[in-house]
Design a protein with these regions (language model features):
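Short active-site neighborhood of thiol/selenol oxidoreductases, capturing the structured segment around
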Residues: 1-9
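Thiol-based oxidoreductase modules, predominantly thioredoxin-like and allied folds used
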Residues: 6, 25, 30-43
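The canonical Cys-X-X-Cys-His
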Residues: 11-14, 57
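Typically the conserved alpha-helix immediately C-terminal to a functionally engaged Cys/Sec
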Residues: 15-28
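Structural micro-motif
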Residues: 49-58
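Non-catalytic, surface beta->alpha helical segment in thiol-disulfide oxidoreductase systems
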Residues: 61-89
Length: 89
């Protein structure tokens, strides 16, 4: 599993997501890779994943298929529910 947040260093909601992303990485350990990409540093990846606003979180299953997407601040409980619905528990 891979969770990527596309954001930016001056984006306030992106900054608010950082502790949640860190908690998710700790909670899922080796079952999921949680990463933060700044769109200014990774514009090609942001375009490839059709990122239109920051932050955008994209979740991929182990086969690389996109299984969830959210734009904006994502409350931890809602984030966990979406991950569980996608199959990551």
């Amino acid at each position: 599993w891979t969770v990527i947040e596309f954001g930016g260093p001056t984006c306030v909601p992106c900054k608010k997501m950082q502790p949640i992303l860190a908690e998710l990485q700790q909670q899922f350990g080796d079952r999921a890779l949680v990463r933060n990409f700044y769109v200014t540093e990774h514009p090609k990846e942001a375009r490839a994943h059709k990122v239109m606003a920051m932050p955008t979180q994209v979740v991929f299953d182990p086969s690389g298929k996109e299984v969830a997407r959210h734009i904006g601040f994502w409350e931890k409980g809602d984030f966990l529910a979406a991950l569980a619905k996608a199959g990551l528990k």
